[in-house]
């Protein structure tokens, strides 16, 4: 049988740094108010780089690190809710920029679960035997979706990209997965709604910026995500002691605190970087993974079991346990 493995990781963030104190100068907030509620102190904001620019930086790094030729890449999946345009896809721009002429490329929209969903799909593509090498990138410029007068949401989000190179392997590395969607709760977190504008339409007011029911999302993350992780471990006969690190979507420090208690895993196993990047949606998990590899916490030698878990708009949530 053929399986997939993560062979390379990379990330990139824009240079512009915006601190909580910077935000306090343009809206009614403070560093203390933001940090005490979220664990976020600063975030990176793009000045002129589009989502594709961030993703291209990651793709270039992955190619350089791997030593592969661009035409050896079979597919590119970009998980994003902030594409450059609805057409062409962000992934198509990445494919062109790195000259991966043999690769098919497409975007996936699953909000903050996007990277996990895309990685699960990429694993199946390689397991089919038809493809050998693929890139999965989470990339966001959420700053263009934020209402900068709304302190409830503007303080949360940042821009960035992270990704992995997947290669075919004889050994199984994706050990377990669970993916979920509950569209009935979709109005809890929305952004980028468009208006009907044909000569025949009655019309509908667009909701361009991010709008969130914070309490509903907080409760959803603690209840549904914790339950799905516990079910996943039980079904796969993987215990909490088998897990070396937990890399969850970087939305809020208090969410991580509560999930750690719910699933009874030591809090120190939960890596985090939201303090420096904020919530980067589909990019948060791969950025966290890339930094953990840089720091030597995760070795990419196939000896560690890592829980990856995303949750967000849709509502969507999903987890993978991977041997890395």
From Swiss-Prot:
The domain of life for this entry's organism is Bacteria
Care to name a GO molecular-function term for this sequence? beta-ketoacyl-acyl-carrier-protein synthase III activity
**Enzyme Commission number:** 2.3.1.180
Predominant location: cytoplasm
The UniProt function text for this chain reads: Catalyzes the condensation reaction of fatty acid synthesis by the addition to an acyl acceptor of two carbons from malonyl-ACP. Catalyzes the first condensation reaction which initiates fatty acid synthesis and may therefore play a role in governing the total rate of fatty acid production. Possesses both acetoacetyl-ACP synthase and acetyl transacylase activities. Its substrate specificity determines the biosynthesis of branched-chain and/or straight-chain of fatty acids.
The text of the family note is: Belongs to the thiolase-like superfamily. FabH family.
This one is known as Beta-ketoacyl-[acyl-carrier-protein] synthase III
Per the UniProt record, the lineage of the source organism begins with:
Bacteria, Bacillati, Bacillota, Bacilli, Lactobacillales
User: Gene encoding it?
Assistant: fabH
């Amino acid at each position: 049988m053929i399986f997939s493995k993560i062979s390379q990781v990379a990330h990139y963030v824009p240079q512009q740094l915006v601190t909580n104190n910077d935000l306090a100068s343009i809206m009614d907030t403070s560093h203390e108010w933001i940090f005490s509620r979220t664990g976020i102190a600063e975030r990176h904001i793009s000045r002129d780089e589009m989502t594709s620019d961030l993703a291209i930086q990651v793709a270039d790094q992955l190619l350089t690190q791997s030593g592969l030729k661009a035409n050896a890449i079979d597919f590119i999946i970009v998980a994003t809710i902030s594409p450059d345009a609805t057409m062409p896809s962000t992934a198509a721009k990445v494919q062109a920029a790195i000259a991966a002429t043999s690769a098919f490329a497409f975007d996936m929209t699953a909000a903050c679960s996007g990277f996990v969903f895309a990685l699960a799909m990429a694993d199946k593509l390689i397991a089919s035997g038809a493809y050998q090498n693929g890139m999965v990138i989470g990339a966001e410029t959420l700053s263009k979706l934020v209402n900068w007068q709304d302190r409830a949401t503007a303080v949360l989000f940042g821009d960035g990209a992270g990704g992995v190179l997947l290669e075919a392997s004889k050994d199984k590395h994706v050990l377990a997965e669970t993916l979920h969607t509950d569209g009935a709760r979709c109005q809890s977190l929305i952004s980028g709604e468009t208006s009907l504008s044909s000569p025949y339409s009655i019309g509908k007011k667009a909701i361009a910026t991010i709008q969130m029911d914070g309490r509903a999302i907080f409760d959803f993350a603690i209840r549904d995500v914790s339950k799905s992780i516990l079910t996943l471990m039980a079904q796969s006969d993987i215990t909490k002691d088998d897990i070396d690190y937990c890399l969850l979507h970087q939305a809020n420090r208090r969410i991580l605190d509560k999930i750690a208690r719910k699933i009874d895993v030591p809090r120190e196993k939960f890596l985090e970087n939201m303090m420096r990047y904020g919530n980067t949606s589909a990019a948060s998990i791969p950025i966290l993974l890339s930094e953990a590899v840089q720091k030597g916490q995760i070795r990419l030698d196939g000896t560690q079991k890592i829980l990856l878990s995303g949750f967000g708009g849709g509502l969507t949530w999903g987890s993978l346990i991977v041997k890395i």
